[in-house]
Swiss-Prot record:
SMART domains the record matches: HATPase_c, HisKA, KaiB
Catalysed reactions, as listed in the record: ATP + protein L-histidine = ADP + protein N-phospho-L-histidine
PANTHER family named in the record: HYBRID SIGNAL TRANSDUCTION HISTIDINE KINASE C, TWO-COMPONENT HISTIDINE KINASE
SUPFAM superfamilies with a match to the protein in the record: ATPase domain of HSP90 chaperone/DNA topoisomerase II/histidine kinase, Homodimeric domain of signal transducing histidine kinase, Thioredoxin-like
Gene coding for it: sasA
EC number: 2.7.13.3
PTM-bearing positions, type Phosphohistidine: H155
Name of this protein: Adaptive-response sensory kinase SasA
Taxonomy of the source species: Bacteria, Bacillati, Cyanobacteriota, Cyanophyceae, Synechococcales
Alphabetized Pfam families for the sequence: HATPase_c, HisKA, KaiB
One GO BP: circadian rhythm
Length: 383
């Protein structure tokens, strides 16, 4: 009799549909640790699935955003999504435990008062209301994700349009020959065509579809970004200094999105650096996991109370005393891109001492990394 479990616990079968970068966020780390290590009253079985490797799960469970947590057993099935999965789960666990106790006694819940105040019908209505709230939160998350995608693509359109305009002006002034002009125009039109495709896909696809991480030479991407902005700094007394080691390892990142981050940070640095100022671009790899990129300027700096806000959506700081427009949606786009790659971005700044923006990118680890094809969706924790 000693080997018999007198109180066998019901199995709680959960499916977490999330990408690898989701699992590095604080909320999901806490969720997984809780389910694996804490006693929540159930025999927990947690399966973690990558939606890129198993896209059929999205249709099977009617998931519109990731990450999502699906309760498979005991029935009925429930889906938790949005930015508060862990909190939602903890709110439901006591209810499931109550259902387990009643079921274990061979009883069924009748439409009578259960606790002296609420009937079973009232509990059912409460459950339905919670489900509706979850679905509403999921839809809101999806709409917000699409809005951020639109802002990202619209912001990125500025670069090829500006470059094409400058090329036309330079050709009219005789500063570049017709062959150079055609080459620049052709490349910029190709970029605009790709961005137009992105815009068409925003309403029908998820965030991850706009990213394609691969083995990437970040040094070359940085050189191209500096060359692309040369028209902005050649006519000014501004020095651009680069410090990139020759043995810098390749990274695992999307080429277009890394270029977008570098262009945005360099453009901001040029905007805020006065004549006679210095801009520095440095890259280093202190660990075997990350390449760290820093872009610093000698501008007016950013007030300490604004240094976190500038990375948020819908935040634009006031104009500086020099008349430059405030930081806009570009930095929030940079944050999203960096986080989607599993990294983080931050700024160190003091008034009148310039600003230094730093972000990290994962180092290329070999063919196995590419086969895993990191799930690039939304939901990273705030840096």
């Amino acid at each position: 009799m000693d080997g018999i479990d007198r109180n066998p616990r019901q199995k709680l079968s959960l499916l977490l549909v999330a990408g690898r970068h989701h699992l590095s966020s604080r909320d999901l780390r806490e969720l997984v640790e809780f389910l694996q290590n804490e006693d929540c009253g159930f025999d927990v079985s947690l399966q973690i699935s990558d939606p890129t490797q198993q896209p059929e799960l999205l249709e099977l469970h009617r998931l519109v955003v990731t990450p999502s947590l699906v309760k498979l057993q005991p029935q009925p099935k429930q889906v938790f999504a949005g930015s508060s999965i862990f909190q939602q789960l903890r709110g439901w666990l006591p209810r499931w435990q109550q259902d387990e106790v009643v079921s274990g006694l061979g009883l069924s819940l009748k439409p009578t008062e259960l606790d002296g105040s609420r009937t079973q019908r009232e509990l059912q209505l409460e459950d339905q209301l919670l489900v509706l709230r979850q679905e509403n939160e999921t839809l809101i998350d999806r709409l917000q994700a699409q809005e951020r995608l639109l802002r990202m693509v619209a912001h990125e359109l500025r670069t090829p349009l500006t470059a094409a305009t400058l090329a036309v002006q330079s050709q009219e002034l005789g500063q570049i020959d017709i062959h150079r002009f055609r080459d620049v125009l052709k490349r910029r039109l190709e970029e605009i065509a790709l961005l137009s495709k992105d815009l068409l896909e925003v309403g029908s696809t998820r965030w991850e579809a706009l990213f394609n991480p691969q083995r990437l030479d970040l040094t070359s991407v940085a050189a191209e970004a500096i060359l692309e902005l040369e028209k902005l700094w050649l006519g000014r007394d501004v020095t651009i200094h680069t410090d990139i080691p020759a043995d810098l390892p390749k990274v695992f990142a999307d080429q277009r999105r890394m270029r977008q981050v570098l262009l945005n940070l360099l453009e901001n640095a040029l905007k805020y650096t006065p004549n006679g100022g210095l801009i520095s671009l440095t890259m280093l790899h202190r660990t075997s996991q990350w390449v760290q990129v820093s872009i610093s300027d000698s501008g007016p700096g950013i007030p300490e109370e604004e240094q976190q806000r500038i990375f948020l959506d819908r935040v634009r700081l006031p104009q500086t005393s020099a008349g430059a427009s405030g930081f806009g949606v570009g930095l929030s786009v940079c944050r999203r891109i960096v986080e989607v790659h599993g990294g983080r971005i931050w700024v160190i700044s003091e008034p009148e001492k310039g600003a230094c923006f730093t972000f990290n990118v994962p180092i290329w680890q070999g063919q196995g990394q590419e086969k895993e094809n990191v799930v690039l969706t939304e939901g990273q924790a705030e840096p």
